[in-house]
């Protein structure tokens, strides 16, 4: 019973009969199949389990569907199996020829004509601006106009005929210019960034140096600022610098702001509020002095000349900086100043009163006999 081949009655036998028992040269002759023990696999089978043969055959030949060929006619398309067929297998064969990607002639002509119009637009605008467009034309002007029309016509024909060439050249040029602009913008942005970082580092180093500097450096810088202010005064006096007197007055009277920033980098942050308070108090005192001075001059119908302005500016500058220094050294001094002034005036009046009362007391303490003797003499 062994090594006997029982052929399967299926479509496989029909296929083998049609092929006239052809042998696959790559896989060799067909092995014998033993149906009893199943030791030998079916021919050219890739399955390890013979029981899966039926499933493979069912999948191969699709027993669940009709094996009859579809009815092809002119008005009916064949029914395809979307699940078994791979996508995009149906391709149309266009045998009519290759498509032409070139632009139509009218579009070429229109684009070329537009280019010539744009090229001539500046000249037309200039002639319209000069009011010389088709006005007072002689033989020479009309000859030039006709020659220019001929040149434009030839240019139109040339641009239309060589449209692909010059359009590609223009496109490449525009792309190149755009890339150049982009690279330039990136380079400028990097330059600005590097410059800003360098300036920030310089400012930081300067601020740290001022913060760690001693008080004498602050005084030296302050003295330099005073020299600059008085240089402005001298140049304004001799006419080398035509500045408004009020501008000089306001600028130099609040010059203590420089000291404010110098002290800000040297002192802790919490003193900034005190600095602003002292500065505004000094400005208030200076404003009061200016208002009183102007009021008195207007009351007595007097005018301040250039020398008077210089005296006023110098006085305000000295008084303002002195008050600011005093306020920074003794916090709250300006607030206590009215009280101190009142106390000083009261002390002065009290001393004057005591002196007057002392003189009266001395006169009252003279004996009567001495007064009579003096009267007799």
UniProtKB/Swiss-Prot annotation:
Keywords: Cytoplasm, Endoplasmic reticulum, Membrane, Toxin, Transmembrane, Transmembrane helix, Vacuole
Region named Disordered: 1-49, 64-100
GO cellular component, one term: ascus epiplasm
The UniProt record lists the keyword Transmembrane: yes
Effect of gene knockout: Abnormal spore maturation in presence of cw9-encoded poison. Sensitises cells to cw9-encoded poison; simultaneous disruption of cw27 enhances sensitivity.
InterPro entries xrefs: WTF (IPR004982)
GO biological process, one term: meiotic drive
Protein family per UniProt: Belongs to the WTF family.
Name this polypeptide is given: Meiotic driver cw9
């Amino acid at each position: 019973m062994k090594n006997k081949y029982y052929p399967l009655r299926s479509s496989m036998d029909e296929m083998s009969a049609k092929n006239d028992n052809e042998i696959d040269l790559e896989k060799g002759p067909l092995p014998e199949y033993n149906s009893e023990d199943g030791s030998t696999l079916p021919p050219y089978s890739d399955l390890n389990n013979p029981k899966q043969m039926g499933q493979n055959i069912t999948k191969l030949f699709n027993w669940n569907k009709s094996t009859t060929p579809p009815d092809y006619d002119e008005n009916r398309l064949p029914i395809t199996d979307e699940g078994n067929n791979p996508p995009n297998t149906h391709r149309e064969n266009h045998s009519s020829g290759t498509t032409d990607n070139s632009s139509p002639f009218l579009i070429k002509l229109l684009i070329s004509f537009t280019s010539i119009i744009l090229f001539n637009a500046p000249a037309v605008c200039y002639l319209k601006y000069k009011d010389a467009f088709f006005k007072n034309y002689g033989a020479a002007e009309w000859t030039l106009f006709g020659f220019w029309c001929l040149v434009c016509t030839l240019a139109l024909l040339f641009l239309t005929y060589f449209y692909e060439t010059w359009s590609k050249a223009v496109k490449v040029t525009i792309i190149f210019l755009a890339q150049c602009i982009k690279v330039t913008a990136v380079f400028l942005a990097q330059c600005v960034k590097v410059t800003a970082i360098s300036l920030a580092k310089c400012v930081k180093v300067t601020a740290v140096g001022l913060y760690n500097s001693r008080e004498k450096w602050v005084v030296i810088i302050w003295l330099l600022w005073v020299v600059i202010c008085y240089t402005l005064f001298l140049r304004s006096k001799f006419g080398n610098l035509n500045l408004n007197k009020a501008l000089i007055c306001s600028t130099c009277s609040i010059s203590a702001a420089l000291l404010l920033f110098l002290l800000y980098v040297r002192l802790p942050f919490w003193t900034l509020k005190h600095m602003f308070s002292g500065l505004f108090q000094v400005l208030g005192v200076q404003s009061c002095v200016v208002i009183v001075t102007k009021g008195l001059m207007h009351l007595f119908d007097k005018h301040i000349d250039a020398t008077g302005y210089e005296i006023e500016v110098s006085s305000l500058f000295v008084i303002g900086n002195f008050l600011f220094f005093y306020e920074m050294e003794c916090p709250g001094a300006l607030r206590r100043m009215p009280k101190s002034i009142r106390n000083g005036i009261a002390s002065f009046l009290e001393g004057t009163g005591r002196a007057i009362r002392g003189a009266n007391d001395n006169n009252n303490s003279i004996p009567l006999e001495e007064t009579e003797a003096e009267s007799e003499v």
